[in-house]
């Protein structure tokens, strides 16, 4: 009887098992369908453009597909507002919005791979808003959208003396050419905020803002006054400082007491006022001459400090060269769009994109980069990379264990210590946020020094021997040199990136010798190259 009860319980469980089995089959089918889905990728974050400059709108398909026969449309706010329309064999301008005519530049270098770019020239404040791009064919339609923010930094503020007002002197600060509406502040010599007497901000036909604001400075209150104007979208501000001697500030109380007397002796009062005015203008002239002299002294001091820092950076670069290492590139890690030379020193972009063997754990599938064969887990190592005249690149070092099957943020938190160039002149690092780098001389060759035990990775401009930037971190694994030539370089035949051959030296300390050419900043040997360097 007990066996019969067990058999009945087994029969009750059969429908439940079948339900789980069919649910599992349906999940596998849905996963297989979604795995082949293609979508459109645009900028991941809002784009900030400056007034009068150009801005780039990149757009691509999530997988390599030929988009040459597709309709590609950039639009504003809605699809019907056409910014640019690509339709084989060439873009059509009849549907283009009037404000964008003769201001767009279409790049189709990688259209066979599903990647295109649109440049909008001479950005205006009215260009601010939401944009998008759409790919359209007989069997596919997809789009991506993003925000464009526009910012304009106006002219340097100017403070003018408007005259005496009540119990003090009235100053006026003016500036123009700002977007969006700027913020303005008056501050005293101790940094305290001063309440403005008046403030007027106007907007011209081009959408740019001009401002005029005034403040009254009273006797004994401030030895100097500054006018500060800041753009809310840019991390910079413009400031003008004027110094006022207390003797020039009117004191109304004694004047009020003497008012009756001046009415009686009006001619004498006029003489006294004339003498005071002459004294005021004489003091003002002396003050201006003193300000000019002080400005020249400050400039000389800053130039001396700059020269000292430059010589200090060159000494650090010279010391780094004694740790020169023979670094070569590993073709097994290179992205399929890159080609590594036979000697392992040069990497360049190739036209065709070969297929990648499935499950290859060494090769990068998304990042167009390549790693070195050498692995560094101790000691100091120095190498140099010739970047030529490329307008975009990244280089540095990364952990050997970084993920290679998808995109990555090139910051120390993800295992990357690199610097980069964007749009020919924007040098920066991610530490962890974007940090802009100011370089006096555009580098054609970058030196990299890795001090593993000290947790330090430094970059040098070999063109003038100056120090650029240093990461300080704690390394937790083997590091490899990292090179990433950007595919969208902006030139038809961009220069390759090359790891330079350096004389490998022992650990001995180099002596200072200004006549040792090997230690001097890098100078090109090709006369034609040298001429181009001078022109640039």
UniProtKB/Swiss-Prot annotation:
Places the protein is found: Membrane
Keyword Lipid biosynthesis included in the entry's annotation: no
Organism taxonomic ancestry: Eukaryota, Metazoa, Chordata, Craniata, Vertebrata
Topological domain spans for side Extracellular: 36-257
Domain B30.2/SPRY: 307-506
Chain ranges passing through the membrane: 258-278
Disulfide bonds: 59-133, 173-227
Source superkingdom: Eukaryota
GO cellular component, one term: membrane
CDD domains: SPRY_PRY_C-I_1
Gene, per the UniProt record: Btnl9
Protein topology in the membrane: Single-pass type I membrane protein
Source organism of the structure: Mus musculus (Mouse)
The keyword Thylakoid appears for this protein: no
Glycosylation sites (chain numbering): 102, 139, 224
SUPFAM superfamilies associated with the record: Concanavalin A-like lectins/glucanases, Immunoglobulin
Protein name from the UniProt record: Butyrophilin-like protein 9
């Amino acid at each position: 009887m007990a066996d019969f009860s067990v058999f009945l319980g087994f029969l009750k469980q059969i429908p439940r098992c079948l339900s789980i089995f069919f649910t599992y089959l349906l999940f596998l089918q849905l996963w297989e369908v979604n795995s082949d889905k293609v979508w459109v990728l645009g900028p991941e974050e809002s784009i900030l453009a400056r007034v009068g400059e150009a801005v780039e709108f990149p757009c691509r398909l999530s997988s390599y597909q030929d988009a040459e026969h597709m309709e590609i449309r950039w639009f504003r706010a809605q699809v019907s507002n056409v910014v640019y329309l690509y339709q084989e064999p060439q873009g059509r301008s009849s549907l283009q919005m009037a404000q964008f005519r003769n201001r767009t530049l279409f790049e189709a270098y990688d259209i066979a791979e599903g990647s295109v770019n649109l440049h909008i020239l001479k950005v205006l404040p009215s260009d601010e808003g939401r944009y998008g791009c759409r790919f359209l064919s007989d069997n596919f339609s997809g789009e991506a959208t993003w925000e464009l923010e526009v910012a304009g930094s106006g002219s340097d503020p100017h403070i003018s003396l408007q005259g005496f007002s009540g119990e003090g002197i009235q100053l006026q600060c003016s500036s123009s050419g700002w977007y969006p509406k700027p913020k303005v502040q008056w501050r005293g010599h101790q940094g305290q905020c001063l309440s403005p007497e008046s403030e007027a901000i106007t907007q011209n036909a081009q959408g740019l803002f001009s401002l005029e604001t005034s403040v009254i400075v009273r006797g004994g209150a401030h030895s100097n006054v500054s006018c500060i104007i800041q753009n809310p979208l840019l991390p910079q501000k413009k400031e003008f400082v004027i110094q006022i001697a207390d003797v020039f500030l009117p004191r109304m109380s004694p004047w009020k007491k003497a008012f009756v007397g001046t009415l009686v002796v009006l001619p004498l009062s006029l003489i006294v006022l004339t003498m005071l005015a002459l004294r005021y203008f004489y003091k003002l002239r002396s003050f201006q001459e003193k300000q000019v002299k002080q400005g020249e002294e400050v400039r000389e001091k800053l130039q001396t400090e700059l020269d000292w820092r430059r010589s200090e950076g060159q000494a650090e670069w010279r010391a780094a060269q004694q740790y020169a290492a023979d670094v070569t590139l590993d073709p097994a890690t290179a992205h399929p769009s890159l080609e590594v030379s036979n000697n392992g020193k040069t990497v360049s972009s190739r036209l065709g994109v070969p297929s990648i063997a499935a499950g290859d754990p060494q090769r990068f599938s998304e990042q167009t980069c390549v790693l070195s064969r050498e692995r560094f887990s101790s000691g100091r190592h120095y190498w140099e990379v010739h970047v030529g005249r490329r307008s975009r690149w990244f280089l540095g070092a990364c952990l050997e264990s970084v993920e290679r099957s998808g995109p990555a943020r090139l910051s120390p938190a993800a295992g990357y210590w690199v610097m980069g160039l964007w749009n020919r002149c924007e040098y920066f690092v991610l530490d962890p946020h974007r940090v802009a780098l100011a370089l006096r001389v555009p580098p054609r060759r970058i030196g990299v020094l890795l001090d593993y035990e000290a947790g330090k990775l430094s970059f040098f401009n070999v063109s003038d021997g100056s120090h650029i930037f240093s990461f300080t971190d704690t390394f937790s694994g083997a590091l490899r040199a990292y090179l990433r030539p950007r595919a969208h370089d902006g030139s038809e035949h961009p220069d390759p990136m090359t790891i330079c051959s350096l004389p490998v030296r022992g650990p001995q300390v180099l002596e200072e010798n200004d006549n040792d050419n090997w230690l001097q900043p890098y100078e090109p040997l090709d006369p034609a190259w040298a001429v181009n360097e001078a022109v640039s």
